[in-house]
Regions:
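Flexible, active-site-adjacent loop/turn segments at secondary-structure boundaries
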Residues: 34, 101, 129-131
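Internal mixed beta-strand/loop scaffold within catalytic domains of large alpha/beta enzymes
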Residues: 46-126
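Solvent-exposed, non-transmembrane amphipathic alpha-helical segments
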Residues: 25, 29, 82, 112-116, ...
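Long, contiguous internal "core" modules enriched in hydrophobic/ aromatic residues
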Residues: 120-173
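Secondary-structure boundary elements
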Residues: 15-18, 22-26, 101, 115-119, ...
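Gly/Pro-rich turn-and-neighbor structural signature
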Residues: 1-80
Length: 173
């Protein structure tokens, strides 16, 4: 199961990278792909664009790390307090700053934490993520569409999610 989930995360990363590369039609942009390894286990890929026609700066990151014990900060109420058999955590994050001030900056991330059994199977897991836009020149129509699209997506999982998450967001910000 965990290998299939990692494939999905990796493919999401690659799809976003390809979409962003297609927005940069000239050779003006500096595109950098950096693959890295973590000594304790796992690694990831960081893709950045600097000084392009569309993006001033952006980053699309993938990571999948493994370890023997989760850091205390990761042991929230939704996870068992012991990860004696190890863990695996993975995620994709995107940060974009377009050149056009009428196109909002954006951020999104998806993440998955798994506590493992002795045989490597998933014992318990926690998933999360979020996304936001920061418009410099907000348009009411764009804001409404963004919220409507978020609601439509969340409604496919639970009709109460949008109201709950919007409330959490408004309290946080």
């Amino acid at each position: 199961m965990i290998n299939e989930l990692e494939k999905i995360f990796r493919q999401s990363h690659l799809d976003i990278v390809e979409s962003f590369k297609n927005l940069e039609s000239s050779n003006k942009a500096k595109l950098v792909l950096d693959k890295w390894k973590r000594p304790e286990g796992g690694g990831g890929t960081t893709f950045t664009i600097h000084g392009g026609n569309f993006f001033d700066n952006c980053a699309v990151n993938f990571s999948s790390i493994k370890g023997k014990r989760l850091p205390k900060a990761a042991l929230g109420n939704s996870l068992i307090k012991s990860s004696n058999n190890g863990y695996q955590a993975m995620g994709v994050s995107v940060i974009s700053h377009p050149k056009n001030p009428y196109v909002p900056s954006s951020h999104m991330n998806i993440r998955l934490f798994c506590i493992l059994e002795k045989n490597g199977d998933v014992k318990e897991w926690w998933a999360g993520g979020g996304y936001d836009l920061t418009p410099f020149f907000p348009y009411k129509e764009d804001c409404l569409q963004w919220h409507n699209d978020a609601k439509d997506l969340l409604d496919t999982y639970n009709k109460n999610f949008y109201k709950k998450f919007a409330k959490n967001c408004n309290e946080y910000f």
